[in-house]
Amino acid sequence: SDVFKMKMSSKILNNEKLYKYNWFNLGGPAKIFFKANSISDIKKFLEDGNNRNKKIHVLGAGSNTLFRDGGFDGIVIKLGAEFAYTKMLNDGNIEVGGATLDKKVADFAMENSLEGFEFLSCIPGTIGGAVIMNSGCYGYNISKSIISIETLTFNGELKSYKSNDIKFF
């Protein structure tokens, strides 16, 4: 595959044991494990013809993920440090990377006198997972705090969605 020859800061591992990446410490190998350090690396990886039409699982903190001992016959994408950030925007809102731990978002909001994120302090996992599952507790959930999200499709296309366009559970 050409992707293995491309210069990337990301890592591609074959038959990587998944027990190392979830809280249950269970799971056999992933056929391909891709630790992504940039959007451009993910795009290159997804554009490679050898990676098309394969099952893909995007892994966050692994707090709500259970892999079979038989492994995963597909691609596991683990977002790296570039995707773990929280920053204050000029309009008073915050931008959060998908790999950012929920607790870090709650702490950042508290430090910046923003309310409505307190519930995240007791939810394990990342914001990416919180959005997918509409995580919440104590009468709050993440859908009440989102203005918009930006995603990368499995075809490598960046897409933005306003919160009212998202069908939360």
Residue ranges of predicted features:
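Phosphate/pyrophosphate- and phosphate-bearing ligand-binding catalytic cores of soluble enzymes
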Residues: 13, 20-23, 65, 152-154, ...
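Short acidic (Asp/Glu) patches
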Residues: 103, 133-135, 164-169
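Anion-binding (especially nucleotide phosphate/pyrophosphate-binding) glycine-rich loop
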Residues: 3-127
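Structural signature of FAD isoalloxazine-binding scaffolds in flavoprotein oxidoreductases
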Residues: 34-39, 66-84, 132-162
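Short beta-strand or tight-loop elements
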Residues: 115, 145, 164-166
